[in-house]
Amino acid sequence: MDWPHNLLFLLTISIFLGLGQPRSPKSKRKGQGRPGPLAPGPHQVPLDLVSRMKPYARMEEYERNIEEMVAQLRNSSELAQRKCEVNLQLWMSNKRSLSPWGYSINHDPSRIPVDLPEARCLCLGCVNPFTMQEDRSMVSVPVFSQVPVRRRLCPPPPRTGPCRQRAVMETIAVGCTCIF
């Protein structure tokens, strides 16, 4: 082999052998770079073991949190309030916003969880931060996010059989914002 082929061969071998080597961070920031995958240590559990321990633990916890939020919403006066006003004395961010929102309960019997808190804008316009009055030159619009739910899939009424469940993402209003 002549020298260009030898050089190409050596370059190929070095690249092939270097693929398994960890790379150093390329950023010039001081401190640590982006964290890599967790290596098991005396106080760390490998990520694959965490996911194998209880696959539905996170979803069950999520559904329990949603149920608690709905219960708190039902026990408060939040559902009755429909005023377009900002209350800076409250700690809740939805009432301190320039596009305040309240919550309603989105009920769907074929979904798990059956009830989801959903944001609804309290103003058509936005609250002017200087006058603290509604300004209709701007518009309050809902902000949407996708949340994981399970859908009950049951056979049509003439047929009988077990219902199945399917995990899906559903779009829900989670807050409001101001646009021009």
Curated annotation (Swiss-Prot):
Residues 1-20 form the signal peptide. Its main location: secreted. GO terms for molecular function: cytokine activity. Residues 22-44 are annotated as: Disordered. It comes from the Eukaryota. The keyword Ubl conjugation does not apply. Glycans are attached at N75. Expressed in adult pancreas, small intestine, stomach, spinal cord and testis. Less pronounced expression in prostate, colon mucosal lining, and ovary. GO terms for cellular component: extracellular space. InterPro entries: Cystine-knot_cytokine, IL-17_chr, IL-17_fam. It is found in: Secreted. Disulfide bonds join C121-C176, C126-C178. Keywords: Cytokine, Disulfide bond, Glycoprotein, Secreted, Signal. One of its GO terms (biological process) is positive regulation of cytokine production involved in inflammatory response. Stimulates the release of tumor necrosis factor alpha and IL-1-beta from the monocytic cell line THP-1. Belongs to the IL-17 family. This is Interleukin-17B. It comes from Homo sapiens (Human).
